[in-house]
Amino acid sequence: MTDAPKVRYIRIWTGRTRKEQFEEYSLYLNEFGVRKIERIPGNIRVEMFRALRADHAEFKVISYWPSEEAIRAFSGEDITLTRHLERDPDYLLELPTHVELFEVY
């Protein structure tokens, strides 16, 4: 039995859409964002969270990684830069430039 890789870093992306786009963007983000991240070598896990707020819909994608090097293979040298999906400009109220990065303690 092999041990699963230990999570050392999490990468958190946050985006907002109009409330009317909640379901449509959920499907799009899951299919073209979450599923893509799941297939990236080195990725341990990825989860999508969503919530309807008073005046918008909010989404978070949290990906779990064993090392900065594993993230870099996916994101490039600056591991905090956002990698937008092709249709994000059609949905998102603003295009975030960076993700949050946390070391798991």
Residue ranges and their predicted role:
Residues M1-V7, E47-A57, R83-Y105:
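Glycine-rich beta-strand-turn "strand-cap" elements at beta-sheet edges
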Residues P5-R11, E20-S26, F59-Y64, T97:
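A broad, low-specificity signal for short, low-complexity segments enriched in glycine/proline
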Residues K19-R45, I79-D88:
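Short amphipathic alpha-helical segments
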Residues R39-N43, Y64-P66, A73-E77, R87-L93, ...:
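Short, surface-exposed, polar/charged, turn-prone segments marking secondary-structure boundaries
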